[in-house]
């Protein structure tokens, strides 16, 4: 695979290999055949980051080969959304002959949505001043004149200049209902929007008919908790990153959801609060004891759940676990399978043509 060529003819084979690999990894815990969710074969990534290489009068996007670390010029990137590809061409054309915008520019980050909005961040090794802002505004206006719905951001050390805003609003059809998700530049969002829809619909399907409330750790911008709110009486969710919490609060209002409560704290702190080990000012006015959480949802970082959180989730009759790293999922299952049984297993091909797999398991108490 090269950045400018996707081996689409190998899509089925690479997906089949992942299914076999996941089944083999899960064999100690379950004999289920994974439910398989396919990605679009191209234009599936909604975000991308590129270094910018200056070569005489020319400049262009590059990435580094993961093995050799050599530079690879990238003029088009079929893994990324069609909007990112349009913007890559337009940004280079707009910056190449503009000394103010190109000087010490070292990276461009793109974030796009299925609703055809974009935030583009230009990263610099220099101070950004009013002259930069004026030139950036002219570039933004020129891009919009090409019918590109784009917001530009300039970044340098301890500096962030938003020309308009640093977010875009995604609209996803999820099980017959449109969901609005605010996505903030430089915050985590699901990279493959088509796969995200399938993950949300699978999570809704496996929690159909759930009793009581839902607890979610690591909720981000509320991606899962807001979609799942329709299956539960109430949802209590934790998140540590301030921009993500603010986006989640916006998303609650935008989707007219009245049964979701977001708390800004780490999963480890929340465990202490639930166990009565510590009291937190942030929890004033929230009666944790009033929640009857029968289901816990976790979508942890690649490192998986720490041992304290493992113990905590075992207290819940139902565990829904989305994993971006099946190796740490299996490590967690060594503990969780002592008390819970795998009822559903899914493979989400979030990152086609790579070794990476995303998967989901539903566990119920034995």
Swiss-Prot record:
Keyword field contains Methyltransferase: yes
GO cellular component: cytosol
Enzyme Commission (EC) number: 2.1.1.-, 2.1.1.35
Keywords: Methyltransferase, S-adenosyl-L-methionine, Transferase, tRNA processing
Biological processes per GO annotation: tRNA methylation
Disulfide bonds: none
Active site: 324, 358
Annotated binding of S-adenosyl-L-methionine, by residue: 190, 218, 223, 239, 299
Top EC category: transferase
Catalyses which reaction(s): uridine(54) in tRNA + S-adenosyl-L-methionine = 5-methyluridine(54) in tRNA + S-adenosyl-L-homocysteine + H(+); uridine(341) in tmRNA + S-adenosyl-L-methionine = 5-methyluridine(341) in tmRNA + S-adenosyl-L-homocysteine + H(+)
HAMAP family membership: RNA_methyltr_TrmA
Family from the record: Belongs to the class I-like SAM-binding methyltransferase superfamily. RNA M5U methyltransferase family. TrmA subfamily.
Function: Dual-specificity methyltransferase that catalyzes the formation of 5-methyluridine at position 54 (m5U54) in all tRNAs, and that of position 341 (m5U341) in tmRNA (transfer-mRNA).
Pfam family, any one: tRNA_U5-meth_tr
Gene that encodes the chain: trmA
Protein's name according to its UniProt entry: tRNA/tmRNA (uracil-C(5))-methyltransferase
InterPro entries: MeTrfase_TrmA_AS, MeTrfase_TrmA_CS, SAM-dependent_MTases_sf, TrmA_MeTrfase, U5_MeTrfase_fam
One GO molecular-function entry: tRNA (uracil(54)-C5)-methyltransferase activity, S-adenosyl methionine-dependent
């Amino acid at each position: 695979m090269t950045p400018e060529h996707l081996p689409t003819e190998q899509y089925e084979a690479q997906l089949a290999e992942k299914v076999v690999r996941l089944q083999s990894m899960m064999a100690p815990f379950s004999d289920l055949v994974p439910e398989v969710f396919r990605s679009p074969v191209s234009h599936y990534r909604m975000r991308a980051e590129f270094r910018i290489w200056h070569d005489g009068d020319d400049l262009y996007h590059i990435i580094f080969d993961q093995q050799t670390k050599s530079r690879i010029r990238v003029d088009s990137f079929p893994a990324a959304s069609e909007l990112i590809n349009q913007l890559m061409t337009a940004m280079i054309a707009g910056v190449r002959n503009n000394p103010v915008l190109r000087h010490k520019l070292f990276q461009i980050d793109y974030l796009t949505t299925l609703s055809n909005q974009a935030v583009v961040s230009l990263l610099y090794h220099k101070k950004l001043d009013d002259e930069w802002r004026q030139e950036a505004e002219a570039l933004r206006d020129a891009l919009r004149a090409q019918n590109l719905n784009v917001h530009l951001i300039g970044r340098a050390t301890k500096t962030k200049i938003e020309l308009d805003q640093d977010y875009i609003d995604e609209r996803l059809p999820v099980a017959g209902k449109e969901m609005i998700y605010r996505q903030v530049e430089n915050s985590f969002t699901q990279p493959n929007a088509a796969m995200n829809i399938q993950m949300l619909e699978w999570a809704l399907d496996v929690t159909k008919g759930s009793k009581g409330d839902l607890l979610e750790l690591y909720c981000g911008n509320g991606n899962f908790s807001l979609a799942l709110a329709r299956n539960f009486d109430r949802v209590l969710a934790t998140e540590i990153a301030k921009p993500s919490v603010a986006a989640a609060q916006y998303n609650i209002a935008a989707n007219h959801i009245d049964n979701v409560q977001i708390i800004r704290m780490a999963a480890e702190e929340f465990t202490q609060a639930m166990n009565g080990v510590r009291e937190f000012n942030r929890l004033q006015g929230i009666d944790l004891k009033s929640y009857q959480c029968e289901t816990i949802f976790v979508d942890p970082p690649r490192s998986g759940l720490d041992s304290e959180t493992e113990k905590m989730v075992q207290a819940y009759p139902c565990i829904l676990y989305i994993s971006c790293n099946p190796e740490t999922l299996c490590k967690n299952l060594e503990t969780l399978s002592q008390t819970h049984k795998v009822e559903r297993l899914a493979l989400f091909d979030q990152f086609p043509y790579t070794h990476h797999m995303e998967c989901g398991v539903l566990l119920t108490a034995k």
